[in-house]
Curated annotation (Swiss-Prot):
PANTHER family associated with the record: CUPINCIN (PTHR31189:SF13), OS03G0336100 PROTEIN-RELATED (PTHR31189)
Species annotation: Oryza sativa subsp. japonica (Rice)
Organism lineage string: Eukaryota, Viridiplantae, Streptophyta, Embryophyta, Tracheophyta
Protein name: Cupincin
Enzyme nomenclature, EC number: 3.4.-.-
InterPro entries from the UniProt entry: Cupin_1 (IPR006045), RmlC-like_jellyroll (IPR014710), RmlC_Cupin_sf (IPR011051), Seed_Storage-Functional (IPR050253)
Glycosylation sites: 297
Main location, first listed in the record: secreted
Disulfide bonds: none
UniProt record similarity statement: Belongs to the 7S seed storage protein family.
Record-level GO cellular component terms: extracellular region
SUPFAM superfamilies cross-referenced by the UniProt entry: RmlC-like cupins
Subcellular location: Secreted
């Protein structure tokens, strides 16, 4: 009887041990699952929000998606700006894109449902527009900027025998904000002709031609896709008719033509770099779109003085070199996990209420807090600087930095530089200085504000240690 009890007791103990082990295994499995799911969610979040420090105001090259990619070139489009409420509605509908074409590459005719403003980063080419019943052919080269209206049928080619043709562009969709499409009249499988969507009866009536002949023309299978290569003699023929002005244009102020930023005198230059700009007064199409283009060549180890734009939001694309940018922002920090948790917690009205509680004190006064947004930048980094946000861009010690800037909302905009010889803070009158800084500190404030003898482009923060994302 004792043996039976002992045996029964041992069996119960073994069963209990087995159940406990299974519980621990289940908990461990769930923990691993939760951990992996959390890692996946964080990774997805990083991919959606640029993957680097400074988001949503900074997006790296990994945020571009290939629309077209062949051995003859690529067309890549930056993902939509991740947090439109923070970045601002001013640029939420715009898209940034990069085009690269190999030597003697040819781009098939197409049109966008978006206005296109582009800057030639490198190389040379020919761009042909079919619009308003005529053909316009333009020679473009490095440093040129140009506007192509939505709906214009465009084809182009790299006219150089050994250099790549590289273009940075800003697209302003006219149908759906933030979304645009490219339409090809002639194609096969890739790209497909948009005529393939129409019925045979409609096409035969429209072109007064039999279906078989239409298919041979508009749905002919071509090798190479949207970007192909062309024989040298055909490239030469395309180049013969192109001009710097509008071939066949009226010569009016509304004439479409390329304008060279680097071929004109910089609006500011010193030992620390050069700044160029193309305004709406010089290009009526830019004024119509409420845009402006700027180019900053910053000497290595130099910086742009902290500044802001009164009305325009700046979209800056790094063309060459490396460095970092800093910005004072009242909306979010430039950080990572805490920012993600905040976005996850705040939804709809609850988010507005929580933000209202953060922004106002016990007496209903707004608590003014500014966060530092900071990120390293390199080629194809994109920076968003909203209107009135003080910011600076610094070139690294090792190489100069070239940045093209698209200013959205540029009509009636002004640039305000906060440090240096042209700082408006130097214009404070004496009574105001005593009230702002305190009577005893007014003279010290004068010394601080007058200590920088240069303006706009300045010597950078040398010897301050390495820069890292924060």
């Amino acid at each position: 009887m004792a043996k039976k009890k002992t045996s029964s007791s041992m069996a119960r103990s073994q069963l209990a041990a087995l159940l406990i082990s299974l519980c621990f295994l289940s908990l461990a499995s769930n923990a691993v699952g939760w951990s992996r799911r959390g890692e996946r969610e964080e990774e997805d979040e990083r991919r959606r929000h640029g993957g680097e420090g400074g988001r949503p105001y900074h997006l790296g090259e990994e945020s571009f998606r290939h629309w077209t990619r062949t051995r003859h070139g690529r067309f890549s489009v930056l993902e939509r700006f991740p947090d439109e409420q923070v970045v601002g509605a001013a640029v939420g509908g715009y898209r940034v894109a990069v085009l690269e074409a190999a030597p003697r590459a040819f781009l098939q005719p197409s049109h966008y449902d978006a206005d296109e403003v582009f800057y030639v980063k490198e190389g040379e080419g020919v761009i042909v527009l079919l619009r308003e019943g005529r053909r316009e052919s333009f020679c473009v080269r490095e440093g040129d900027a140009m506007v192509i209206p939505a709906g214009a049928i465009v084809y182009s080619a790299n006219t150089h025998s050994s250099k790549w043709f590289r273009v940075v562009m800003l697209l302003n969709p006219v149908s759906t904000p933030g979304h645009f499409e490219e339409y090809f009249p002639v194609g096969g499988d890739r790209p497909e002709s948009f005529f393939s969507a129409f019925s045979d009866d409609v096409l035969q009536a429209a072109f007064n031609t039999r279906r078989e002949e239409l298919e041979k023309v508009f749905e002919r299978q071509r090798e190479g896709g949207e970007i192909t290569t062309a024989p040298e003699e055909q490239i030469r023929e395309l180049s013969k008719s192109c001009s710097r002005g509008g071939g066949g244009g009226s010569g009016s102020e509304w004439e479409i033509k390329p304008s060279s930023l680097t071929g004109k005198s910089p609006y500011f230059s010193n030992n620390h770099g050069k700044l160029f700009e193309l305004t709406g007064d010089e290009c009526r199409h830019l004024k119509k779109l409420d845009l402006q283009i700027g180019l900053a060549n910053i000497t290595r180890g130099s910086m742009i003085a902290p500044n802001y734009n009164t009305r325009a939001t700046k979209l800056a694309v790094v063309l060459q070199g490396s460095g970092y940018f800093e910005m004072a922002c009242p909306h979010v920090s430039g950080g990572g996990s805490s920012e993600r948790r905040e976005r996850e917690r705040e939804h709809g009205r609850r988010r507005e209420e929580e933000q209202g509680e953060e922004e106002h004190g016990e007496r209903g006064e707004k608590a003014r807090r500014y966060h530092k947004v900071r990120a390293q930048v390199r080629e194809e980094s994109v920076i968003v600087i909203p209107a009135s946000h003080p910011a600076t861009i610094v070139a690294s010690e090792g190489e100069s930095l070239a940045v093209v800037c698209f200013f959205v909302g540029a009509n009636h905009d002004e640039k305000v530089f906060l440090a240096g010889r042209n700082s408006p803070l130097r214009q404070l009158d004496d009574p105001a200085k005593k009230l702002v800084f305190g009577g005893s500190a007014a003279r010290e404030a004068d010394r601080v504000l007058a200590a920088q003898p240069e303006q706009i482009l300045l010597r950078g923060p040398h010897g301050r240690g390495s820069v890292s994302d924060m």
